[in-house]
């Protein structure tokens, strides 16, 4: 029997947003192969739910599960998981092997995984070798930074994500080796660059897109090694 005869495209209503979405015949074949039921959430809502699993930006005050003192954490205070200060988590004061459990092949894997997850200590956030940068997560070797995440070796930076070796800047996303920048994404090796995207080695410029080696340029795109350009003219 051809797959098209066995499986049909089906339109379902998302249980979350109530919008219709289509499950293709090829999808049904895949679900049957791996023995899982068809989805009840549309792709967009499923994507949001997967994103919700990993939190790097929202920070909370919550009690340390060991000491009871308030710590800064990426985990909401209402979660059942045990959270401890990162210094304790990295120390030799506890043995991770103490939390090991035998796997029961007669029970559902995810039920056992959740039980294990709810008993082992998690570090409240990851922020090693930080100086005056308490409100940062996955931000290694930061100095005088505030609310940055997924970052490395930054100084005096705020409200940024996925940045490397940045100084005196804020509101950046995926920017490297730059200083005095604001509202830039996917840029690197720039100085005093503002409101720009996908630029390299640009200086004293505003509102650029896909520019390289530009100085004192404004509202332009696709420039290479140009100076004093306004709207690509």
Predicted regions located by residue number:
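Long, distal/terminal scaffolding or interaction modules
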Residues: 1-233
């Amino acid at each position: 029997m051809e797959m098209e005869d066995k499986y049909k495209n089906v339109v379902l209503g998302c249980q979350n947003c109530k919008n219709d979405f289509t499950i293709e015949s090829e999808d049904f074949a895949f679900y049957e192969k791996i023995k899982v039921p068809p989805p009840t959430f549309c792709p967009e809502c499923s994507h949001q739910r997967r994103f919700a699993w990993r939190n790097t930006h929202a920070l909370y005050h919550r009690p340390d599960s060991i000491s009871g003192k308030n710590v800064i954490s990426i985990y909401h205070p209402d979660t059942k998981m045990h959270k401890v200060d990162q210094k304790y988590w990295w120390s030799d004061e506890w043995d991770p092997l103490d939390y090991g459990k035998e796997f029961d092949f007669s029970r559902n894997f995810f039920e056992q995984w959740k039980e294990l997850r709810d008993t082992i200590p998690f570090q409240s956030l990851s922020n090693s070798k930080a100086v005056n940068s308490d409100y940062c997560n996955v931000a290694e070797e930061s100095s005088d930074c505030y609310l940055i995440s997924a970052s490395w070796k930054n100084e005096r930076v705020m409200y940024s994500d996925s940045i490397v070796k940045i100084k005196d800047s804020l509101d950046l996303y995926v920017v490297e080796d730059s200083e005095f920048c604001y509202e830039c994404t996917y840029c690197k090796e720039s100085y005093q660059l503002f409101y720009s995207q996908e630029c390299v080695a640009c200086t004293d410029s505003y509102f650029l897109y896909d520019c390289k080696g530009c100085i004192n340029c404004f509202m332009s795109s696709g420039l290479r090694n140009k100076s004093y350009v306004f709207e690509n003219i």
